[in-house]
């Protein structure tokens, strides 16, 4: 992928942040049930991952799409549909690499190295496509969770991670030296989803420990780019997990100060958002892989985004 595409995606996210909007926290509209969200899906129901999640969320929000399903022009045609004239597609990306063989000028020996890069392709929301089978146009399901109760599926998910969580005080944080998450009591939060979204954020931080994912971005004091990068990973990872678990991400009270620190990172490095999304995806996948196995039910979004395959082949 050319650098101008990195610029294009980063600049759009920067514009949203400068407007005070976190693109990964506003992926819903009035047509979605009570603000409940889902990851964007491919034509075969498999979820997108990484940076593609909130790129498609941003496009859905901007265009007012309620349907979460996206597909290529060819996939639409092979399903019997057609993209309406004048509709513009949305860029999604996937990782690829090439292997180069080079000869050492002094020794004459050949050596190989792998060069990673990003490639992109275009998809359309099903609301831009006519004459698809009817089930592609289905609206989001009605909410089934009572907001006044603890959310048992989320409780079970968090318990299965094995993270050490203590309750008390009025701050939420992960303490690496003790490998422990500290949370205010459940009843201190304005609603259950605020509690769980906050705990998911701290649980993503928990994955950085050396005995788990060993994630390190350098300097870790407030205001440092390393600190801001880790917070960005936790923020995006919590948004991914919230979507997987069917809860609405929380807006933190320190919204403005964090946005300022993220803007600094993104403006200094056009690839930083790709790195943050990749680390966030790995953290979410790590936590899903700690869950008890269910027959024939893969963990959401453990599949990396790849190029679109011909119909009849499984997209992964």
Q: For each of these PLM feature ranges, what is it?
A:
Residues 1-316:
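N-terminal accessory/interface modules of nucleic-acid-binding and processing proteins
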């Amino acid at each position: 992928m050319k650098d101008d595409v990195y610029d294009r995606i980063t600049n759009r996210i920067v514009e949203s942040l400068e407007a005070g909007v976190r693109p990964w926290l506003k992926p819903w509209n009035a047509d979605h049930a009570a603000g409940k969200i889902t990851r964007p899906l491919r034509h075969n129901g498999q979820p997108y991952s990484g940076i593609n999640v909130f790129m498609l969320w941003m496009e859905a929000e901007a265009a007012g799409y309620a349907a979460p399903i996206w597909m290529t022009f060819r996939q639409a045609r092979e399903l019997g549909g057609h993209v309406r004239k004048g509709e513009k597609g949305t860029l999604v990306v996937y990782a690829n690499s090439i292997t180069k063989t080079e000869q050492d000028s002094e020794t004459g020996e050949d050596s190989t190295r792998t060069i990673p890069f990003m490639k992109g392709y275009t998809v359309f929301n099903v609301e831009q496509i006519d004459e698809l089978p009817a089930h592609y146009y289905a609206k989001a399901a009605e909410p089934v969770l009572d907001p006044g109760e603890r959310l048992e599926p989320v409780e079970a998910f968090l318990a299965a991670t094995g993270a050490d969580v203590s309750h008390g005080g009025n701050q939420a944080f992960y303490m690496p030296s003790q490998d422990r998450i500290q949370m205010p009591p459940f009843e201190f939060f304005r609603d259950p989803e605020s509690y769980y979204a906050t705990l998911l954020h701290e649980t993503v931080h928990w994955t950085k420990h050396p005995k788990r994912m060993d994630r390190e971005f350098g300097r870790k004091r407030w205001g440092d780019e390393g600190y801001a990068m880790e917070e960005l990973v936790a923020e995006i990872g919590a948004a991914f997990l919230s979507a997987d678990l069917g809860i609405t991400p929380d807006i933190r009270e320190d919204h403005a100060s964090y946005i300022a620190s993220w803007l600094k990172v993104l403006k200094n490095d056009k690839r930083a958002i790709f790195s943050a999304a990749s680390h966030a995806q790995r953290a979410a996948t790590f936590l899903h892989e700690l869950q008890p196995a269910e027959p024939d039910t893969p963990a959401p979004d453990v599949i990396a985004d790849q190029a679109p395959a011909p119909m009849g082949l499984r997209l992964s």
